[in-house]
């Protein structure tokens, strides 16, 4: 792995760890991190009481070219939804029978933003 990629990887893991600690302080229970399934990766999976919470963590050094939240495109949301559906299916669950939400932890410079229920599976159904 090249140094720049390694540095980006470690930086990403650092911010994911910070997000995990923050969310635990808010009362969420940690389940898993960096879950890879066919078609995607979920940064953090946590539980908020009986609700599965799938979390995407994004970081930008500055907001000069848009904040971290702006990097979560429709395509990225669709991949996260698919990855969560696969993860649930592997456990005998699905969106229709489980309480789920998709949160975003966006870090731009020193600013930390937690968006609960930032999007959901209904965005892609007609």
Swiss-Prot record:
GO MF, one annotated term: nucleic acid binding
Similarity section: Belongs to the UPF0102 family.
Protein name: UPF0102 protein plu4003
Organism listed in the record: Photorhabdus laumondii subsp. laumondii (strain DSM 15139 / CIP 105565 / TT01) (Photorhabdus luminescens subsp. laumondii)
């Amino acid at each position: 792995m090249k140094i720049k990629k390694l540095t980006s990887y470690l930086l990403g893991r650092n911010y994911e760890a910070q997000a995990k600690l923050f969310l635990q302080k808010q009362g969420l229970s940690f389940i898993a991190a960096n879950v890879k399934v066919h078609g995607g990766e979920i940064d953090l999976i946590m539980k908020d009481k009986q609700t599965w919470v799938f979390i995407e963590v994004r970081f930008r050094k500055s907001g000069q070219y848009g904040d971290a939240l702006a990097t979560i495109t429709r395509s990225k949301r669709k991949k996260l939804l698919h990855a969560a559906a696969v993860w649930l299916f592997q456990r005998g669950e699905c969106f229709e029978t489980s309480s789920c939400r998709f949160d975003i932890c966006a870090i731009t410079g020193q600013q930390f933003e937690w968006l609960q229920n930032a999007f959901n599976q209904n965005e892609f159904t007609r």
